[in-house]
A protein has these predicted regions:
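Metalloprotease/metallohydrolase-associated module, dominated by Zn2+-dependent proteases
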Residues: 2-21, 27, 55-112
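Helix-boundary and loop/linker segments of multi-pass membrane transporters
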Residues: 32-33
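Short, surface-exposed, low-complexity cationic segments
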Residues: 36-38
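Active-site recognition of the HExxH zinc-binding catalytic motif
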Residues: 40-52, 89
Length: 112
């Protein structure tokens, strides 16, 4: 996974975004992170990359978008954190070995 530092992508309120396997980070945000926070971000985005591969990339973005819309409409408290893809990534972003043991479609499994 390649990390691209820049000042355009993602939008200013976000630090990192994974677009088709390339991770774009806001330069000033990335430079301010501790080494552990950088590692945690890489694990988080690597989990997203595994999710993308399972759903052939386009499927990931379609489902992510619709789940985000649903989470805004139904329980309007922090839709981003309630998206199944994000829940899995946040739960396991501190586990450096998670991807070695991750089950397919873990974002929808209770035992993730």
């Amino acid at each position: 996974m390649r990390i691209v530092e820049n000042n355009i992508i993602p939008f200013p309120d976000f630090g990192a975004i994974n677009l088709f396997g390339e991770v774009f980070v806001r330069e000033e945000w990335w430079d301010g992170l501790s080494p552990w926070s950088k590692k945690r971000t890489i694990i988080h985005e690597s989990i997203h990359q595994a999710q993308m591969r399972e759903l052939l990339y386009v499927g990931f973005y379609i489902l992510y978008f619709f789940e985000w819309i649903y989470q805004i409409i139904v329980p309007p408290k922090g839709a981003y954190r309630w998206i199944s893809f994000e829940r899995e990534a946040f739960i396991h972003e501190n586990d450096e070995e998670y991807l070695d043991n991750r089950k397919y479609f873990a974002q929808w499994r209770e035992d993730r």
